[in-house]
């Protein structure tokens, strides 16, 4: 049975609102881990959207695939999945499996090394594909989403394996921007599907 992620979470690098004219980074947590994974958070100095979750780091445990997006970071509401770094560089939300695979590489030399991350549709023919299904729980505060479907490709003895996260989404019924149905996310305004996710079938 899957164990839900607790709302407590860790912050690795935060762009904080500070007095200087450039962006300031602060390393707030040394190990960057929580009970069931890690969130990377960032603030945008001139962005009224507020706090956002940049990406989710998966540690490889099949029981840790429920991703509960916290409602707040401190007093700041988390209104976005993904966003922009610095002065406007796009930073879409994605699920990062590479840390888990990098750990495997350190243990077993036959696993090989990371070669690339890409959209699952770009995986080369003949590549073995391994799917992992995640459930993302969105709060009522999420207003904007910049998401990226992602595949991490490893080469082992000349053979490529693509690790592809897939998602089902459960959105809070009180969210005024989005709603979920059958694991997919839609805009309330016009009932169109939110793209950028690799939805589970």
What are these model-derived regions, one by one?
Residues 6-7, 37:
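Short amphipathic alpha-helical "recognition" segments used for binding
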Residues 1-4:
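Positively charged n-region of N-terminal signal peptides that target proteins for export
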Residues 20-201:
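Solvent-exposed loop and capping/linker segments of extracellular ligand-binding repeat ectodomains
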Residues 8-16:
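Bacterial N-terminal signal peptides
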């Amino acid at each position: 049975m899957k164990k839900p992620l607790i709302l407590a979470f860790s912050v690795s690098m935060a762009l904080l609102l500070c007095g200087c004219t450039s962006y300031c980074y602060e390393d707030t947590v040394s190990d960057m881990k929580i009970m069931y994974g890690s969130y990377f958070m960032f603030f945008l100095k001139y962005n009224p959207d507020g706090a956002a979750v940049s990406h989710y780091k998966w540690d490889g445990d099949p029981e840790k695939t429920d991703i509960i997006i916290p409602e707040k970071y401190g007093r700041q509401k988390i209104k976005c999945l993904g966003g922009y770094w610095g002065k406007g560089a796009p930073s879409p939300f994605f699920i990062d499996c590479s840390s888990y695979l990098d750990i495997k590489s350190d243990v077993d030399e036959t696993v090989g090394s990371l070669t690339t991350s890409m959209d699952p549709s770009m995986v080369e023919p003949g590549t073995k594909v391994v799917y992992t299904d995640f459930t993302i729980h969105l709060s009522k505060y999420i207003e904007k989403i910049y998401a990226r479907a992602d595949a991490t490709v490893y080469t082992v003895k000349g053979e490529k394996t693509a690790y592809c996260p897939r998602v089902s989404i459960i959105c809070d019924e009180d969210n005024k921007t989005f709603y979920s149905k059958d694991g997919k996310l839609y805009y309330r305004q016009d009932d169109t599907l939110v793209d950028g996710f690799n939805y589970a079938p």
